[in-house]
């Protein structure tokens, strides 16, 4: 909240937000909230980025333009890789069990 001093010698100030002209009082202290509002806007952007990180289709705060679906594609590739690895491990284990059963039965 900033004040414009219209006439400092007669203590007249104006609030630019409401365009009200008033007498400046000696017994009140006026603090500017602009730095607080700037920090709140920055924190609001960080909180919005935290919420956007939960959605794979939203852009992140520090990412390059055009990388909105990066998390989605990384999830597809990562899950496909682990699916193939688990599938091959299961198939190899199944083949080993079948091979051992045939050895036990005596046929080759």
From Swiss-Prot:
EC number: 7.2.1.4
GO cellular component: plasma membrane
Disulfide bonding pattern of the chain: none
Pathway: One-carbon metabolism; methanogenesis from CO(2); methyl-coenzyme M from 5,10-methylene-5,6,7,8-tetrahydromethanopterin: step 2/2
GO molecular function annotations of the record: tetrahydromethanopterin S-methyltransferase activity
Keyword Translocase: yes
Subcellular location: Cell membrane
InterPro entries: MtrB_MeTrfase
GO biological process, one term: methylation
Keyword Translocase appears in the UniProt entry: yes
Reaction catalyzed: 5-methyl-5,6,7,8-tetrahydromethanopterin + coenzyme M + 2 Na(+)(in) = 5,6,7,8-tetrahydromethanopterin + methyl-coenzyme M + 2 Na(+)(out)
Bilayer-crossing regions: 80-100
Membrane-protein topology: Single-pass membrane protein
Subunit record text: The complex is composed of 8 subunits; MtrA, MtrB, MtrC, MtrD, MtrE, MtrF, MtrG and MtrH.
Family per similarity comment: Belongs to the MtrB family.
HAMAP family given in the database record: MtrB
Entry protein name: Tetrahydromethanopterin S-methyltransferase subunit B
Species this chain originates from: Methanosarcina acetivorans (strain ATCC 35395 / DSM 2834 / JCM 12185 / C2A)
């Amino acid at each position: 909240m900033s004040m414009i001093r219209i006439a400092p010698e007669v203590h007249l100030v104006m609030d630019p937000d409401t365009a009200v002209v008033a007498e400046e009082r000696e017994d009140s202290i006026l603090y500017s909230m602009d730095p607080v509002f700037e920090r709140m806007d920055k924190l609001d952007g960080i909180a919005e980025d935290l919420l956007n990180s939960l959605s794979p289709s939203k852009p992140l705060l520090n990412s390059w333009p055009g990388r909105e679906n990066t998390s989605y594609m990384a999830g597809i590739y990562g899950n496909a890789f682990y699916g193939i690895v688990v599938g091959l491990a299961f198939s190899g284990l199944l083949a080993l069990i079948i091979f051992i059963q045939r050895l036990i039965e005596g046929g080759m």
